Amino acid sequence: MYRTMMKAKLHRARVTESNLNYVGSITIDEDLMDAVDLLENEKVQIVNNNNGERFETYVIKGPRGEGGICLNGAAARKVQPGDVVIILSYAMMENAEALAHQPKVAILDENNRIVEMLGTEPASTVR
């Protein structure tokens, strides 16, 4: 049996831009992608803390060190610059692997800089 487990999480990312006229996807600072092991074209779920929207798209690399989080194409209708979002990816794994799995969770500040890295999802991530 396979289980779908959280693999990566960028917690409390701030949307820096939305670009309706781009083909699609979410552009993420490549440093943030590396921190939580996201790959270009990987499917992600976006949860908008400001309006409750949940949707899926795929990742494209953004410039390193700028903290950019840009929703593109139709997804741009779901966010506004300044919105706080959670970016999640999942992986399917067999039960034994799932029991030992530790996701990569990055807690971000208001400038999308990593303030803490976690190896699991704690009971409270209120910061």
Curated annotation (Swiss-Prot):
GO terms for MF: aspartate 1-decarboxylase activity
Where is coiled-coil annotated? Answer: none
Q: Which reaction does it catalyse?
A: L-aspartate + H(+) = beta-alanine + CO2
The residues annotated as the active site are S25, Y58
Q: Which cofactors, by name?
A: pyruvate
From which domain of life does this come? Bacteria
Instruction: Name its pathway.
Output: Cofactor biosynthesis; (R)-pantothenate biosynthesis; beta-alanine from L-aspartate: step 1/1
Its Gene Ontology biological processes? Answer: alanine biosynthetic process; pantothenate biosynthetic process
Q: Where are the Pyruvic acid (Ser) residues found in this chain?
A: S25
Return the EC number: 4.1.1.11
User: Under which main EC class is this enzyme filed?
Assistant: lyase
UniProt entry keywords in alphabetical sequence: Autocatalytic cleavage, Cytoplasm, Decarboxylase, Lyase, Pantothenate biosynthesis, Pyruvate, Schiff base, Zymogen
Modification comment: Is synthesized initially as an inactive proenzyme, which is activated by self-cleavage at a specific serine bond to produce a beta-subunit with a hydroxyl group at its C-terminus and an alpha-subunit with a pyruvoyl group at its N-terminus.
Q: Which residues bind substrate per the record? A: T57, G73, A74, A75
Quote the record's cofactor note. Binds 1 pyruvoyl group covalently per subunit.
Q: Which InterPro entries match?
A: Asp_de-COase-like_dom_sf (IPR009010), Asp_decarbox (IPR003190)
Where in or outside the cell is it found? Answer: Cytoplasm
Q: Which family does it belong to?
A: Belongs to the PanD family.
Q: What does this protein do?
A: Catalyzes the pyruvoyl-dependent decarboxylation of aspartate to produce beta-alanine.
Q: How does it assemble?
A: Heterooctamer of four alpha and four beta subunits.
Name of the protein in question:
Aspartate 1-decarboxylase
